[in-house]
Regions:
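Bacterial Sec-dependent N-terminal signal peptides
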Residues: 1-42, 254, 258
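Transmembrane beta-strand segments of Gram-negative outer membrane beta-barrel proteins
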Residues: 38-53, 74-76, 81, 197-199
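Outer-membrane pore/translocation modules
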Residues: 40-55, 61-64, 89-186, 235-237, ...
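Membrane-spanning beta-strand positions in outer-membrane beta-barrel proteins
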Residues: 45, 80, 109-111, 158, ...
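N-terminal, post-signal-peptide region of Sec/Tat-exported proteins
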Residues: 66-93
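A generic beta-sheet turn/junction motif
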Residues: 74-78, 190-192, 222-226
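Outer membrane beta-barrel transmembrane domains
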Residues: 118, 122, 194-237, 242-244, ...
Length: 265
């Protein structure tokens, strides 16, 4: 039987997986199971985006070509399951991220959300199979946690921090990543025809293993309440960094938005 020895994680690699990340993931998965058994209002929705350039959760990383993005959500009062599925336009998977999130503080000007996810990043690699090099479609596996405090000053202005800690358990790097961002959100800005603009500028610091960098990015989205079509754009500029990647990244996309609320008894 062929062996993909090049891409099998070692036992040692699995043992040193940070206990905190594992704890977060198991706790949130258990909480989601509890939520599924509870009655109350649930909401299912999402955004499907077709873009000229797939951009990752960390905007300094991209697919580098057109992509189709599925951001889905099943949420209750406090818990939500938010899968993010990314594909190239050729139908090949790029990344699958399965978020579990908990709203620790809600319904107040100050909110706090924590979350965790397993993630799978797909790519074509040259690997050795029975001593011969072959090009195969393989996945890298990651586990991550997030903490997101936010303060809402008004219906149009919010500010907060976002921290993402990731760990890979693969035979190749990256092994550890830390992402810390200062967020500002300007929302409900009228742009005509009942359409509203949302702008999310972000200054962030990223550390990946022994490399690090500082960047500034901004997301723009235009949508209309009750209308399923929206538009988005992103720009990301490297300020100073030793992390490999483009100095400037941008994309534009068209979105399909949907949402439905139902009562579980």
């Amino acid at each position: 039987m062929p062996r993909l020895a090049t891409y099998l994680p070692s036992t040692k690699k699995l043992v040193i997986l940070p206990e905190l990340l594992l704890f977060f993931t198991l706790t949130l998965l258990l909480a989601m199971q509890v939520q599924a058994q509870e009655s109350g209002s649930k909401q299912i929705g999402g955004v499907i985006t077709a873009t000229n350039n797939g951009v990752s959760i960390i905007p300094s990383f991209t697919l580098g070509r057109p992509a189709l993005l599925f951001d889905l959500s099943l949420s209750g009062e406090r818990f939500s399951f938010d899968p993010m599925l990314r594909f190239g336009m050729d139908g090949k998977p790029w990344s699958f991220v399965f978020w579990g999130r908990y709203k620790a503080i809600k319904d107040k000007p100050f909110t706090l959300t924590v979350g965790a996810h397993p993630a799978f990043i797909f790519a074509e690699r040259i690997v050795k199979v029975n001593g011969q090099e072959k090009t195969m479609f393989v996945s890298q596996r990651f586990l991550a946690m997030e903490v997101a405090p936010m303060y809402k000053f008004s219906n149009r202005l919010s500010m907060g921090l976002y921290y993402l800690r990731g760990h890979g358990f693969n035979p190749i790097p990256p092994d550890n990543s830390n992402f810390l961002a200062l967020n500002t959100v300007f929302s409900n800005i009228p742009v005509g025809g009942d359409f509203n603009l949302r702008v999310n500028p972000q200054l962030f610091y990223l550390k990946v293993d022994d490399t690090s960098g500082t960047y500034i990015t901004s997301n723009f989205s235009v949508s209309k309440p009750g209308f399923p079509i929206g538009f988005q754009a992103l720009v990301n500029q490297k300020i100073k960094s030793t992390i490999p990647g483009d100095d400037f990244i941008w994309n534009v996309g068209i979105q399909y938005l949907f949402s439905n609320t139902f009562q579980k008894k």
